[in-house]
Amino acid sequence: MDRFRPLAVLIAAALTLSGTTALSSAARAADADLARNGGFEAGLDGWTCTAGTTVNSPVRSGSSALKATPAGSDNARCAQTVTVQPNSQYTLSGHVQGSYVYLGASGTGTTDVSTWTQSAPDWRQLTTTFRTGPSTTRVTLYTHGWYGTGAYHADDISLVGPGGGTEQPPAPPTGLRTGSVTATSVALSWSPVTGATGYAVYRDGVKVATASGTSATVTGLTPDTAYAFQVAAVNGAGESAKSATVTATTAPGTGGGSADLPPHALVGYLHASFANGSGYTRLADVPDSWDVIDLAFGEPTSVTSGDIRFDRCPATECPNVESDAEFKAAIKAKQAAGKKVLISIGGQNGQVQLTTTAARDTFVSSVSKIIDEYGLDGLDIDFEGHSLSLNADDTDFKNPKTPVIVNLIQALKTLKAKYGDDFVLTMAPETFFVQLGYQYYGTGKWGGQDPRAGAYLPVIHALRDDLTLLHVQDYNSGPIMGLDNQYHSMGGADFHIAMTDMLLTGFPVAGDAANVFPPLRADQVAIGMPATTNAGNGHVAPAEAVKTLDCLTRKTNCGSYATHGTWPALRALMTWSINWDRFGGWEFQRTFDGYFG
């Protein structure tokens, strides 16, 4: 890739002002510095930066300069788009300090250019030139560092050449007002702005939506929560200043999306088809503390068949297994006590790939048969391993194209429609398929990444209005980058806090600020933890579980990770598994009961 190769030659173009090829005096007069706030004297105005700020020292001139710090997969890119003339020559220059600092231009319509320095302990000027294409009217200027290196500085960035016209950013919108407000959404409208080609909507200072007209509905909100909204007008010259702020408080939750669960619920998996070394636990013997019981597992007859079967544990493996009649009676007794009993599909060994519409339809019919036979309350999706992955051209989580993703979404929507509003739908993805999407999504822009990275995001997003609970498995995980751009590892409260904060705050997918996965409601989110050290890697002591809950629901007892909010409505704790918790003396259950009462 070009970013691995510095330019062999820095082109210094000289304009010859003679003969028929000479620029006219009018064109020469039009040459100007088109970079907005290239000296960073107005902070980051005009620039979009992933990890940048302005500082007063060191500076090359004036009183401010850019400081940007790469971290993880973020190279600390700062960019702005300027209006240019077609078929015109431009000179881009800037002064930088640091190691592996780049300056470049993209969208030129000819050959995009960049230049760099390996080491600049003092201010060093970088310069490059380009010619725009026959229809180019906008070019993006950028500077960035390199992954894993230290902070870099930039100052006095300029783009000299013919101006692209007199277009200026539009005026800020006026008349911003709220309309219909539900438990999870707020409708907004505003007055039109002359010269605007679109609008950007901000929630609590973060861009969350764009609109071509003068209205938008912001979704994915938490019930009974106050939000602040602003809107900016957009045209070819950029964004306006933001409008005046309006506030709205979402309506209280109605309980329809939470399937009548208690305000705080305990979720556990019951080994119903195997013992797994922890011993078999009869459903009737599960204590009343457990609000949602996931029967593990329904598995496919083959990976791509879509034909799901639920076979109860054989007596040879589980000598104390109850009869089918006793099992069904126990389900009814749990339901009469207000508990939810679900069939969980997948697990470590039950890979499910709905590669065809026929497999999709078979999935729906076979899962329905299990639900109907046992009178269950709903379905848990625990697809692991290679069940979900993204095709190379599938880059937008809001509009997936990969058959295994699309067919799963359609199947779950069909089941939800069949069984109605009381149908309980939960999911238990691994961090690799969800939070890793903050850094990587599918195979990536240049290919070569694991296609499973972030692959659950389109499923969660498409079903967010139907989803009762998402309990990501915060265990058996490698280090995952949080919203602080630091890697977090299992074994303490910080990992659970950082992973859950990502779900409740939302995050740019693969670092793309224009492609944000919206937050889930707090009442939809549970934290997945292993019940004992035998159950999985990443077990934490009860004190660490309490720290996690304190920080997320009360913003107390927090560690090094700074959350982006406080969520007293956080719904649940989930564990693998009820059997292992019994094996460990019910420690997980006692921690939950002791905290929530």
Curated annotation (Swiss-Prot):
Fibronectin type-III domain boundaries: 172-253
Keyword annotations: Carbohydrate metabolism, Chitin degradation, Chitin-binding, Glycosidase, Hydrolase, Polysaccharide degradation, Signal
Thermal activity characteristics from the UniProt entry: Optimum temperature is 55 degrees Celsius.
Gene3D superfamilies noted in UniProt: Galactose-binding domain-like, Glycosidases, Immunoglobulins
UniProt EC number: 3.2.1.14
SMART domains referenced in this protein's UniProt entry, alphabetically: FN3, Glyco_18
Record-linked SUPFAM superfamilies: (Trans)glycosidases (SSF51445), Fibronectin type III (SSF49265), Galactose-binding domain-like (SSF49785)
Entry annotation: catalytic residues: E384 (proton donor)
A Pfam family assignment: Glyco_hydro_18
Regulation: Inhibited by the pseudosugar allosamidin A.
GO BP field: chitin catabolic process; polysaccharide catabolic process
GO molecular function per UniProt: chitin binding; endochitinase activity
Catalytic activity: Random endo-hydrolysis of N-acetyl-beta-D-glucosaminide (1->4)-beta-linkages in chitin and chitodextrins
PTM notes: The N-terminus is blocked.
Keyword presence, Hydrolase: yes
Keyword Signal appears in the UniProt entry: yes
Activity profile over pH: Optimum pH is 7.3.
Induction: By chitin.
Domain GH18: 264-597
Top EC class for this record: hydrolase
Signal peptide: 1-29
Primary role: Exochitinase that generates exclusively chitobiose from chitotetraose, chitohexaose, and colloidal high-molecular mass chitin.
Family the entry assigns: Belongs to the glycosyl hydrolase 18 family. Chitinase class II subfamily.
Name of the protein described by the UniProt record: Exochitinase 1
